[in-house]
């Protein structure tokens, strides 16, 4: 993996974790962003999360907040084109 992509993924992970925490949704309590993977063309960002409570509810809450999270990423991370966010449970992460 190129340094640039790894660095960008780290920035996106950090920014997303902070923005998710700022949502103050009770379904997102004790939710951790474990990893992010940017697709080769940069159009999709797979976000792997672990919820210590109701995981399905947390994934639904994140999907509903996708537009708000992308807008927040636009303010924090400089990218030519922002990716679509795809929220997945941590156990489904690629090896």
UniProtKB/Swiss-Prot annotation:
It is found in: Cytoplasm. InterPro entries: KH_dom-like_a/b, RbfA, RbfA_dom_sf. Its main location: cytoplasm. Keywords: Cytoplasm, Ribosome biogenesis, RNA-binding, rRNA-binding. GO terms for cellular component: cytosol. The keyword Cytoplasm applies. One of its GO terms (molecular function) is rRNA binding. The keyword Cytoplasm applies. Pfam families: RBFA. GO terms for biological process: maturation of SSU-rRNA. One of several proteins that assist in the late maturation steps of the functional core of the 30S ribosomal subunit. Associates with free 30S ribosomal subunits (but not with 30S subunits that are part of 70S ribosomes or polysomes). Required for efficient processing of 16S rRNA. Probably interacts with the 5'-terminal helix region of 16S rRNA, bringing together different domains of the 30S ribosomal subunit which aids assembly. Interacts with the 30S ribosomal subunit as a monomer, binding in a position overlapping the sites of the A and P site tRNAs, and displacing segments of the 16S rRNA. Probably contacts 16S rRNA and ribosomal protein S9 and S13. Belongs to the RbfA family. This is Ribosome-binding factor A. The gene is rbfA.
């Amino acid at each position: 993996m190129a340094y640039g992509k790894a660095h960008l993924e780290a920035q996106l992970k950090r920014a997303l974790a902070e923005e998710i925490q700022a949502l103050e949704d009770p379904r997102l309590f004790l939710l951790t962003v474990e990893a992010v993977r940017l697709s080769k063309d940069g159009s999709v960002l797979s976000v792997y999360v672990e919820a210590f409570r109701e995981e399905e509810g947390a994934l639904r809450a994140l999907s509903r907040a996708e537009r708000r999270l992308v807008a927040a990423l636009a303010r924090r991370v400089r990218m030519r084109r922002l990716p679509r966010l795809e929220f997945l449970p941590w156990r489904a992460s690629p090896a």
